A protein has these predicted regions:
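A bilobed periplasmic-binding-protein/Venus flytrap-type ligand-binding module shared by bacterial periplasmic
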Residues: 169-174, 214, 292-307, 326-330
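Extracytoplasmic ligand-binding site segments that recognize negatively charged/polar headgroups
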Residues: 42, 70, 115-240, 246, ...
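Beta->alpha turn/N-cap motifs
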Residues: 36, 86, 105-110, 204, ...
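A ligand-binding cleft/hinge motif common to bilobed small-molecule-binding domains
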Residues: 111-113, 261-278
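Early extracytoplasmic/lumenal segment of secretory-pathway proteins
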Residues: 24-113, 117
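Periplasmic-binding protein-like
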Residues: 227-237, 276-299
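N-terminal secretory signal peptides and thylakoid transit peptides that target proteins
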Residues: 1-18
Length: 391
């Protein structure tokens, strides 16, 4: 999901900067973090400071796009490979080298790449109480071998702190006016005639082929598409029914009533619900594609960074119940540790399926795992063949 969550967020980075400039402290211990804007509530930063037994200095800076954070990891790696060619723009305020960054937000989509390119190093967090409570689905995702492939006994390469999914958004007001029932599952895009030419799909083969696989009772991570009966026929039919494909311009048509439904990413839909509360969303009953934001540690080779106890303290702090609830309620993306009931949520979001997602649906959903090159070629060939049927 390369393009997901690339829309600029609100004022999160400014709020973090203001908070830290006011209370960064002068303690000897320092934690330097580069994170995705609005993925951590600013309230947690001051709470973490209060939680420490001694004064600490927090250096948090937010970026608006995950791709920018991946590039930061690449820049750190280049700097470490050629320290004599270090340039001033790779320095942090105060003259510290960028290799002193302790943690960076990384989307799980890029975890394999980051491991293969040696941009990050394993995290020694297996003994943390939070790790012991982290659901197996997330533990499995971040255990990888040195090539970035899933490995049951692999090292831990990331610490998940929030997640989201591909969902179906719809205009509840328009549905009520038309007397339509809300969508419930992917199959509605095929079988409900009133939806024909009324919905948009993400312009990504992994997403569209994946939801079709789910409709057929398969996994998003199916490796041999040729062995899935009726897959091509189902995709061709879906292609006839969709109004348009877009990964970055699907919300405006929904707001303007040019479409009645849109397949999109939960964080983006949560954001527009603040201004357009009639836009609702449903997590498809047969399961969906999942993503997660991770804390990763740059592969700096810096002994001071590796031994920084604040790294583990911060990760474990993010996994605490109160922190998990704050992340879930204030960022629009549930924490993997948020095992609270609906009654624990504010009334306004108790019934918001973007946050209060049922465990049954979650168990049916899939993180997008790395695929072999042969499978990637199958996806691309099938995608191109199906899209040619649009004319």
């Amino acid at each position: 999901m390369v393009n997901r969550r690339s829309v600029l967020a609100g004022m999160g980075a400014t709020a973090i900067a203001q908070l830290l400039s006011a209370c960064s402290g002068t303690g000897k211990e320092k934690l330097t973090v580069r994170l995705l804007k609005d993925s951590i509530p600013v309230q947690l930063l001051s709470a973490f400071r209060r939680d420490q037994s001694q004064q600490v200095k927090l250096n948090f800076k937010a970026e608006t796009q995950l791709k920018s954070l991946l590039k930061l990891l690449e820049d750190i790696h280049k700097q470490n490979q050629s320290p004599s060619q270090e340039t001033s723009w790779l320095r942090l305020p105060g003259g510290n080298r960028s290799s002193s960054i302790d943690l960076v937000t990384l989307g799980d989509y890029w975890l394999k790449l980051a491991i293969q390119k040696e941009l990050i190093q394993p995290l020694p967090i297996e003994q943390l109480s939070g790790w012991q409570s982290l659901p197996p689905q997330w533990q499995t995702l971040v255990r990888r071998d040195n090539q970035g492939k899933l490995a049951e006994n692999g090292q831990i390469w990331g610490a998940p702190y929030r997640w989201g999914a591909t969902v179906i958004a719809y205009d509840a007001k328009q549905f009520k006016d038309q007397g339509w029932e809300p969508p419930r599952d992917w199959s509605d895009l095929w079988k409900r005639e009133e939806f024909r030419q009324q919905f948009s799909l993400l312009d990504q083969p992994r997403e569209v082929i994946g939801l079709t696989l789910k409709k057929l009772g398969k996994s998003y991570n199916t490796q041999d598409l040729n062995q899935v009966p009726n897959l091509k026929a189902e995709l061709i039919e879906l292609n006839k029914r969709v109004k348009f494909y877009s990964s970055d311009a699907y919300l405006q048509p929904l707001i303007l009533k040019d479409t009645s439904l849109a397949v999109g990413w939960s964080t983006e839909i949560f954001d527009i619900q603040k201004s357009y509360p009639h836009i609702k969303a449903v997590m498809p009953a047969s399961g969906s594609a999942l993503w997660t934001d991770l804390w990763v540690q740059p592969a700096s080779g810096n002994e001071e960074t590796e031994s920084n106890s604040l790294v583990n303290d911060w990760i474990d702090f993010c996994w605490r119940k109160q922190s998990a609830e704050a992340i879930s309620q204030l960022t629009g993306s549930p924490s993997p540790m948020a095992n609270f009931s609906r009654q624990d949520l504010p009334t306004a979001i108790q019934d918001n399926p973007l946050i209060a997602i049922s465990s049954e649906v979650l168990e049916k959903s899939d993180f997008l795992e790395p695929l072999p090159e042969t499978t990637i070629e199958q996806y691309q060939d099938l995608w191109e063949e199906v899209r040619r049927n649009l004319e």
